[in-house]
């Protein structure tokens, strides 16, 4: 006579075999990766790039908000200034061996310079190759925001003119005049 423990074991083995038999005739879910590309959702967060303004200048103003927002501290940059007073990063470095692709840097960027692309093929054999410099990250195009130019929106100081005297600029509002 079989003990109750062996009956339970035999029943679970038969159930497992039945499940395997049912799945035997279903289509395979394997995708042959290099030949067949997988479906990537539209908001996939992949490789990070630095974009340019419509006039070809770097969008990044080295405000350091991306580095502060990064939870794993994988972004490093140093600010410098050109002759016109425009800020730009002297160096911009992302360590992709630490990056978790959370997208906080893209959300923190006021100039839309940092953008995450759907590219996910970043495999490397050596860890130092995962540290990308500004030259590796900078693209020739404007990315997701083709018409946005930070300095047209925010403005730069114009020599000889005070606030509100430049083209397309309104004079500042006196806040005290708005009070009841």
UniProtKB/Swiss-Prot annotation:
It catalyses: a quinone + NADH + 5 H(+)(in) = a quinol + NAD(+) + 4 H(+)(out). InterPro entries: 4Fe4S_Fe-S-bd (IPR017896), 4Fe4S_Fe_S_CS (IPR017900), NADH_quinone_OxRdtase_chainI (IPR010226). The keyword Transcription does not apply. Its EC number is 7.1.1.-. It is found in: Cell inner membrane. SUPFAM superfamilies: 4Fe-4S ferredoxins. One of its GO terms (molecular function) is iron ion binding. Keywords: 4Fe-4S, Cell inner membrane, Cell membrane, Iron, Iron-sulfur, Membrane, Metal-binding, NAD, Quinone, Repeat, Translocase, Ubiquinone. Its main location: membrane. GO terms for cellular component: plasma membrane. [4Fe-4S] cluster 1 binds at residues 60, 63, 66, 109. Its cofactor is [4Fe-4S] cluster. GO terms for biological process: aerobic respiration. It is a peripheral membrane protein. It is an enzyme of class 7 (translocase). It holds the Pfam family Fer4_7. PANTHER family: NADH DEHYDROGENASE [UBIQUINONE] IRON-SULFUR PROTEIN 8, MITOCHONDRIAL, NADH DEHYDROGENASE UBIQUINONE IRON-SULFUR PROTEIN 8, MITOCHONDRIAL. HAMAP family: NDH1_NuoI. NDH-1 shuttles electrons from NADH, via FMN and iron-sulfur (Fe-S) centers, to quinones in the respiratory chain. The immediate electron acceptor for the enzyme in this species is believed to be ubiquinone. Couples the redox reaction to proton translocation (for every two electrons transferred, four hydrogen ions are translocated across the cytoplasmic membrane), and thus conserves the redox energy in a proton gradient. Belongs to the complex I 23 kDa subunit family. NDH-1 is composed of 14 different subunits. Subunits NuoA, H, J, K, L, M, N constitute the membrane sector of the complex. This is NADH-quinone oxidoreductase subunit I 1.
